[in-house]
Amino acid sequence: MSATSTSRVSREERREAILNAARRHFVSTGYHGTGMDDVANTLGLSKPIVYQYFSSKHDLYLAVLEKAGKNLQDTISTALNQSGSNRTIVRASVRAFFDFVDDDMQYYQLLFDSDMLDDIEAAEHVEQVMSTVVTYIAHHISHATTLDPARAQLLASSVVGASTSAAKTWVKTARHELDLSLIHISEPTRLLSI
């Protein structure tokens, strides 16, 4: 068979397919309602094949969570790496967070609204993701303003905390009623024009 044959899938492509199928199941039926056989059946695979990639459902869940976190971190990092004023860039990072929520609702749900948030490893992973996002923003703030690193970290934590809280409310109550472009969630960034 040739390398381009549709019947042969690379190990990485299969791993991605398993992660995507698992993400859909974990979001729709929760961690406890999802079995490895559900993921395997979705892809037309045997359960032992899924276990070749992930040793347990918990390992699979953490891998999906890791992918969600990387997606969020990349989204924020991209927003922070554009040109413009400090205020514009931090506003763009807030907007990027809301775009992540809107575009990647399943990843958002896994990170912030999952039945596994009480799992120690999952909670630590989400905390690490958010800590990294805060660090990205704080680094940008401290290099673009006269704020010392500790104050930049505090301000970045405030921006991320406010964005996370507002996003939860937006998702639960007003997501389809409010035009996101009209939400001035990033007004606290006015403080950054110091």
PLM regions: where:
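Hydrophobic alpha-helical connector segments
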Residues: 63, 77-103, 155-159
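Alpha-helical DNA-contacting segments of helix-turn-helix folds
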Residues: 59-68, 75, 129
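Helix-turn-helix
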Residues: 17, 21, 25-59, 63
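Single conserved hydrophobic/aromatic residue that forms the stacking wall/gate
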Residues: 183-194
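Amphipathic alpha-helical packing segments from all-alpha helical-bundle domains
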Residues: 70-73, 120-145, 153-158
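Amphipathic alpha-helical segments used for helix-helix packing
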Residues: 100-121, 138, 165-172
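N-terminal intrinsically disordered/low-complexity leader segments
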Residues: 1-13, 150
